[in-house]
Amino acid sequence: MRAPTRVYLRGVGRRYLSEWPFNEAHEKILREYRPARHYRLGLFIPCAYGKPYSQSYIHYLFRRTLAPYIREGLVHEIILTNAGVVPRELDEYWPYTAYDWNPHMETEEIRACYRRVLKKRITDYLTAFSGYYDEFAAYMRHDSDSWAALREAARELGLEIINLAPPSVDPRELEEAGLGLPEYMQDPDLLLVTKTALERLDEGLRRLLG
């Protein structure tokens, strides 16, 4: 049988959550992927509009705080997205570079489906690979569906996963982080690159890894 064409997926809904190619990509990770080493910390982080995620504005800024810990092999980034649970070293590969999920188009039904599908995938990942990590933490908005899915998966597995991001910051910090650009100001994850959030991230990493 001829292999399916590598398409670009743009939209929201079940088609962009649990069907081809994301379902197959998830199964392939469970079947063939292995973390490169044993890590002190597995850090769950959000996806980004820019692809690959590592070159997006949000990831570029908070990775500057993570950089020393990544270089020392202490922290492994694990990205949570409608496309699945994506280890950082796979974020430059299809299909994770070829989709656009617009959160402004989500309905409550779609959000519930997102949480349900992502929770299952997180549970799969933690069950398969938790032996590669001493512990886990998150750095994502407290009001995000990804954090809700992660908390539920952790609860069912009996794991404690703390969120190193602050619940909120001064709105003036958001304006500063957004550089006055509308495309940045519209991103709710802008909170993660504010001064307060980045300081909180660094303090949390020092506490966990010091």
Sequence positions of predicted segments:
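Anaerobic metallocofactor- and corrinoid-dependent redox/one-carbon enzyme cores
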Residues: 93-94, 102-108, 138
